[in-house]
Design a protein with these regions (language model features):
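Charge-dense, helix-prone N-terminal extensions
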Residues: 1-112
Length: 112
């Protein structure tokens, strides 16, 4: 997905900031990451409250390889229909935003 695609998807619901990371893009709303895009796939933030909903739909978590191990992050694939249908995207976005809001903010590193 291009940055334009991400803006088109998210901006009708909330102002977003995009930042490059993991060879992909992170999507921020109100200073919190709500999604990551890697290799054209969008993964939405989950937590213990929202993860079961994603699992019920058979959606897969974001994984990557590090030091010979498979690492799993708390982001799940977005359903295919949500890419093209704003009405289908809205509830999934809401779940991701709520999960991000419940997560503690990362502490800022002290400047030297």
């Amino acid at each position: 997905m291009t940055h334009d695609d991400l803006y088109e998807l998210f901006c009708p619901l909330a102002p977003v900031a995009l930042k490059r990371m993991f060879g992909g893009t992170s999507v921020y709303v109100d200073g919190r990451i709500v999604a990551i895009e890697v290799d054209g796939v969008l993964y939405l933030k989950v937590d213990a409250v929202t993860e079961p909903r994603f699992e019920e739909e058979g959606l897969k978590p974001f994984t990557y390889q590090a030091k010979g191990k498979t690492m799993t992050m708390r982001y799940y694939q977005m359903p295919d229909e949500a890419y093209e249908d704003p009405d289908a995207f809205r509830p999934w976005f809401r779940l991701a935003k709520e999960a991000a809001e419940r997560a503690p903010l990362a502490k800022k590193k002290a400047s030297r």
